[in-house]
Every structure is written in C-alpha cells, then in structure tokens.
A protein has these predicted regions:
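Glycan-recognition and catalytic cores of secretory/periplasmic carbohydrate-active enzymes
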Residues: 90-93, 97, 101, 108, ...
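Short, charged, amphipathic alpha-helical segments
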Residues: 254-258
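An alpha-helical support segment within catalytic cores of ATP-dependent transferases
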Residues: 88-100, 105, 110-150, 220
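ATP-binding pocket architecture of kinase catalytic cores
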Residues: 1-109, 120
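Histidine/acidic-rich helix-loop-helix segments that form or flank divalent-metal centers
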Residues: 216-222
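Active-site activation/catalytic loop segments of kinase-like enzymes and analogous catalytic loops
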Residues: 112-121, 180-216, 228-248, 260
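Active-site acidic catalytic loop and adjacent metal/ATP-binding pocket
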Residues: 1, 83-84, 138-184, 194-195
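Short, solvent-exposed segments of well-ordered alpha helices
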Residues: 67, 101, 105, 194, ...
Length: 260
C-alpha cells in the first residue's frame, strides 16, 4: 500500500474519481482502498517501482531500442485509445482539475507561459502583437476538431509503470475532455525518451491501428493535425522548463530545453 497526503483537495478528488471510473472501465490504474472524509488522505495500491522511463533506459541512452523495449512501447501506445475513448465513456468531466476541457483559454494560458517563461526569459527578440495573432490562430487550429474523448495531458513514459510486463497508468489527475492528438504528441515527442524517427513512425502506426477500434481514421488529416499538436506540446514544455530553469534556477531544466 501507498499512503498519500495531498495538499490540493480538488486535485485529490479528480484523481480519486478518475481512478475509480477507469477501474470500472477495465483500465490498468491503481486501486484506491480507502479515503478520508475530507479527501486529503487515501491509501492506494502499490504498483512497484518500475517506470516505463526506466525500463527503456538502454534505448534512451543509445537511441537503439531492443525488442523488449519496443514491445513495452507498443503495448503502451496501443492502450492509449482505450484510455481516451473508454475512459471518457460516462465520465463526469466536472471533476477534472484545474480545467474540465481543452479550450481556447487553456491553450492561451500555455502559450503565454511559453512567451513569458521561455521567450522573454531567454531574451529572444520578437514582435509581441504578431506573436499574439499567431497564438490565436494556433488556438483556432487546435480546436477545429471537436472531441468528447479523455485527454490525459501528461501521457509520457514517466507516468506509466510496468507491472508483470504490462503498462499501468498513473498521474492522470490533470486530464480533461480534449482531442486525441495531444497525448500522442506528449508520448512520442517526449524529449528525454530519444525515440528515433523510425521507431516513432512505427509507434504511430500502432496507435492508429488501435484507434480504428473506436473510430474511422483519415490518416492524412490525422498526421496534418498531429503536427500542430507536436508544436503546441513542445512550446508548452519549453514554457514549463523555462520557468524551472530560468526562474527557479534549476540547471537541469535549462539543459532539457536544449534537447528541443
């Protein structure tokens, strides 16, 4: 068992609700056994200490992924459509924290985080009015495909655990209603994963194949729209890393920016 004491009651409630909802849908998430009346404390299942990030360490360091590592990645990316569609089925998105859905406001928050914590922090020269115009255009493009699916938001190898050779999901409490592309971009373009392009393309095909169980896929449109989400996710991460590196003075995050 793992005992958890969470400072944010809203975030705790999001996790507790989602964990129960996902388990009811047959998704591999930790079981919560008991919670306090105020939702500050709870006991959950211990999934061990094997992160997918660590399980693919050799591949990350050499960019040469062995068959066992590839198989773990295939299993994980093929699980994603089930999370997005089955996970969204019957979900009360009002529990999501801090936002119930991926919308223009949340997009502009992330883009302005990128502007203030990365562009301005690095002293980069740009025309602010034109940048704001581009931000609005990007928001319009990202929202042009309506969706009722679950968006994990931080679907990457540090948030997947390996138990008995299978992927299990953690740290999903920041999820919300949103398009499928964001999580694909988060997973396959994670900077420190160091996936070679050939492996990334292989995993994209695995994802699309699994996605077809839930909806028809226009591959040309899918790839075109995914490009915009890869750019957006990269900007969002650079903003977060910029804040940690330039404002909190943590050199590790400045080094991570260089990987992008």
């Amino acid at each position: 068992l793992i005992g958890v004491s969470g400072e944010s009651v809203e975030e705790n409630r999001a996790f507790l609700y989602m964990a129960e909802h996902f388990r009811q849908k047959g998704l591999p998430v930790p079981q919560v056994f008991i919670r306090s009346e105020d939702d500050i404390y709870y006991l959950q299942e211990d999934l061990g200490d094997s992160l997918l990030f660590n399980a693919i360490e050799k591949g990350r360091k050499t960019s040469v992924f062995g068959e066992e590592e590839k198989q773990l990645l295939r299993k994980t990316i093929r699980l994603l459509p089930a999370v997005q569609f089955a996970g969204a089925d019957g979900m009360d998105f009002s529990y999501c924290y801090p936002q119930a859905e991926f919308n223009s406001r949340s997009i502009l928050w992330d883009l302005n985080y990128f502007k203030y914590c990365f562009l301005k922090a690095t002293g980069m020269d740009f025309q602010e009015d034109r940048l704001e115009d581009d931000f609005q255009k990007m928001a319009d493009v990202l929202l042009r495909s309506s969706s009722a699916t679950f968006m994990y938001r931080d679907f990457q190898s540090r948030n997947v655990m390996i138990k008995d050779g299978e992927p299990w999901l953690i740290d999903f409490q920041g999820g919300r209603k949103g398009p499928v592309y964001y999580d694909v971009a988060s997973f396959l373009w994670q900077a420190k994963a160091n996936y070679p392009d050939s492996l990334r393309q292989e995993l994209l095909k695995e994802y699309i194949d699994a996605l077809r169980k839930y909806q028809p896929v226009d591959e040309a449109y899918f790839y075109a729209q995914l490009r915009h989400f890869v750019l957006f996710r990269t900007m969002q991460v650079l903003g977060a890393y910029g804040f940690r590196g330039y404002f909190e003075k943590k050199p590790h995050f400045i080094q991570s920016c260089l990987l992008y």
